[in-house]
Swiss-Prot record:
Belongs to the SHMT family. GO terms for molecular function: glycine hydroxymethyltransferase activity; pyridoxal phosphate binding. It comes from Mesomycoplasma hyopneumoniae (strain 232) (Mycoplasma hyopneumoniae). The gene is glyA. Its cofactor is pyridoxal 5'-phosphate. It is found in: Cytoplasm. Catalyzes the reversible interconversion of serine and glycine with tetrahydrofolate (THF) serving as the one-carbon carrier. This reaction serves as the major source of one-carbon groups required for the biosynthesis of purines, thymidylate, methionine, and other important biomolecules. Its EC number is 2.1.2.1. GO terms for cellular component: cytosol. This is Probable serine hydroxymethyltransferase. Its main location: cytoplasm. The keyword Signal does not apply. CDD domains: SHMT. The keyword Transferase applies.
């Protein structure tokens, strides 16, 4: 379990401890959240946060960089080994800033970006109009087919018609495997760069639980906190020396200043953990758990987007299945200490603030040791809560008791830790 901390600032100390208590005592099913190891958290809260060091190892604009240079080099070498790739930049502050760096390095303002429609599982930074990617570049969308799967022939037709400069594959709510080789064929036909945004599935790729984009995508971006279980941060990978040089120039001095060396150290620790044999076992269990979890709902007649999952997440169409919107479902479940997030579904008729879907993921609770049996229990509880719609005081008490037993039996430091 995450330990209590004591600061001189009692107000902040109390709030941090309350948040740690919340994490310890609730079921976490948000697909983009996970539990970093104590080593990662410790590395992220060290004196390294005091150090400034604009530039790259051996080429800094500040003195006193002997040790931070070594740390950044180690992080780079570890992540290159993890993904079997030639070049890596570990300085991006987030996944979105990593994407911004790629766009700035490879595109001109107004160039065309082709990405999955946001409602269908795309991401804001893939060309959505209210995001920088849609403000400074021309965002074009592709969609899922009638089975809610990627239709590569249809994507190719859109690409041939619109001639994008960059095609993005990699999503925030798509539950099926991605054919990176097919995407590269499409990109080559229109002379476009192919960007694989693997923020959600990076850990699964590293562990061999999802096909790798290495060798197909010109460039790869990721976060480090989701299935990789590292600190909050970004990452850029490529096998192209030319692209790597452009990326380095854009990350610094183009869009960022001094790197967060405390975070880079924590990334290095997470990369080392992901290279351990137990991490492959952990990611395999994530996928098993997600498949089993989704199947439990399908058995109950609940509609799952694309009728299943091959990765770590899936989305329930709560509007058609329970006559609830995603916001209502999220609030209901939080009232019994089960944390989820509302999510749009393909062709959603409701706003992103309401949604027709509820996204569920297995990485965090798999970190705590949940296996198929526990996810069967979760499906029973969630289905009961959403069917009832309104819970009385006794029902809330009983469900909270069940959740408490599960969180007590599976504390944060229960399984799959170094």
């Amino acid at each position: 379990m995450y330990k209590k901390i004591k600061l001189r600032d009692q107000q902040i100390s109390e709030l941090i401890n309350l948040e740690s208590k919340r994490q310890n005592s609730q079921i976490e099913l948000i697909a983009s959240e996970n539990y970093a190891s104590e080593d990662v958290i410790l590395a992220n809260g060290t004196s390294l946060s005091n150090k400034y060091g604009e530039g790259y190892p051996g080429k800094r604009y500040y003195g006193g960089c002997t040790f931070i240079d070594q740390i950044e080099k180690i992080a780079i070498e570890r992540v290159k080994k993890l993904f079997k790739i030639e070049y890596a930049n570990v300085q991006p502050y987030s996944g979105s800033s990593a994407n911004a760096a790629v766009f700035a390095a490879l595109l001109k303002p107004g160039d065309k970006i082709l990405g999955l429609d946001l409602n269908a599982g795309g991401h804001l930074s893939h060309g959505y109009k209210i995001n920088f990617s849609g403000m400074f570049y021309s965002g074009i969308s592709y969609f899922l087919d009638e089975n809610e799967l990627l239709d590569y022939d249809a994507i190719e037709k859109i690409a041939l018609k619109t001639k994008p400069n960059l095609i993005i594959c990699g999503y925030s709510a798509y539950s099926r495997k991605i054919d990176f080789a097919r995407f590269r064929q499409i990109a080559d036909k229109v002379n476009a760069f192919l960007l694989a945004d693997i923020a959600h599935i990076a850990g699964l790729i590293a562990a061999g639980q999802h096909p790798s984009p290495v060798g197909y995508a010109h460039i790869i971006t990721s976060t480090t906190q989701k299935t990789l279980r590292g600190p909050r941060g970004g990452l850029i990978l490529t096998n192209s020396k030319e692209i790597a040089a452009k990326i380095d120039k854009v990350v610094f001095p183009g869009i960022q200043g001094g790197p967060f060396f405390h975070t880079i150290a924590a990334k290095a620790v997470a990369f080392k953990e992901a290279l351990e044999p137990w991490f492959k076992e952990y990611c395999a269990q994530i996928v098993k758990n997600a498949s089993h979890f989704a199947s439990e709902f399908i058995k109950k007649g609940i509609r799952i987007v694309s009728q299943g999952t091959e990765n770590h997440l899936f989305t329930i169409d709560v509007l058609s299945s329970y006559n609830l919107n995603g916001k209502q479902a999220q609030i209901l479940l939080e009232s019994v200490n089960i944390i989820t997030n509302k999510n749009t579904i393909p062709n959603d008729t409701l706003s992103p603030f309401v949604t027709s879907g509820l996204r569920l993921g297995t990485p965090a609770m798999t970190s705590r040791g949940f296996k198929e049996q526990e996810f069967s229990q979760m499906a029973e509880i969630i289905d009961f809560v959403l069917r009832k719609k309104e819970l009385n005081a006794l029902e809330i008490k009983e469900i909270k008791k069940k959740v408490k037993i599960l969180t007590k039996n599976f504390p944060i430091k229960k399984s799959y830790w170094p």
